[in-house]
């Protein structure tokens, strides 16, 4: 998580939760001259388009006042979807036993990309069973993690 993403998370978590939703996480993606702020929300009853629109309006109001982003960007609000991104230790705990794809910032055993089953979480370390062996990854070293849906 970048410094800007951390700042945005701290700024937006309370307004999103006040609207009755969980702020699962967010990503700020820079792509040339165009950037995107993608916010993932969830609710115990699921998420629909109206929920996304409601949160988008709430978040836009906060961003307009605080103005933390200095470049032009698009705002996207969505559910986490089938390939749910995992941002926090609690997300890994929630999905113990599920398959995950992980991309690391710094390689472990000469690999940055891993796939396996979430085995457990201990503080800021997640354990994943990869090809029968348990591998430990510091949450701070995980660049991106997504559930792999079963069909």
From Swiss-Prot:
Top-rank taxon: Bacteria
InterPro entries tied to this protein: Ribosome_maturation_RimP, RimP_C, RimP_C_sf, RimP_N, RimP_N_sf
GO cellular component, one term: cytosol
GO BP: ribosomal small subunit assembly; translation
CDD domains membership: YlxS_C (cd01734)
Predominant cellular place of this UniProt entry's protein: cytoplasm
Keyword field contains Transferase: no
Record's keyword terms, sorted: Cytoplasm, Ribosome biogenesis
Localization per record: Cytoplasm
Entry's family note: Belongs to the RimP family.
Function noted in UniProt: Required for maturation of 30S ribosomal subunits.
Protein name: Ribosome maturation factor RimP
Gene designation: rimP
């Amino acid at each position: 998580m970048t410094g800007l993403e951390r700042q945005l998370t701290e700024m937006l978590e309370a307004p999103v939760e006040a609207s009755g939703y969980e702020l699962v996480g967010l990503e700020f993606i820079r792509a040339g001259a165009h950037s995107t702020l993608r916010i993932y929300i969830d609710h115990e009853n699921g998420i629909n388009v109206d929920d996304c629109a409601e949160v988008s309006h709430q978040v836009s109001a906060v961003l307009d006042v605080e103005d933390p982003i200095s470049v032009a960007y698009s705002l996207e609000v969505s559910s986490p979807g089938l390939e749910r991104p995992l941002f926090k230790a609690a997300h890994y705990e929630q999905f113990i036993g599920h398959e995950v794809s992980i991309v690391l910032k710094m390689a472990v055993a000469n690999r940055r990309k891993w796939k396996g089953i979430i085995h457990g979480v201990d503080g800021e370390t997640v354990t994943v069973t990869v090809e029968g062996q348990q591998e430990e990854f510091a949450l701070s070293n995980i660049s991106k993690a997504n559930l792999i849906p079963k069909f």
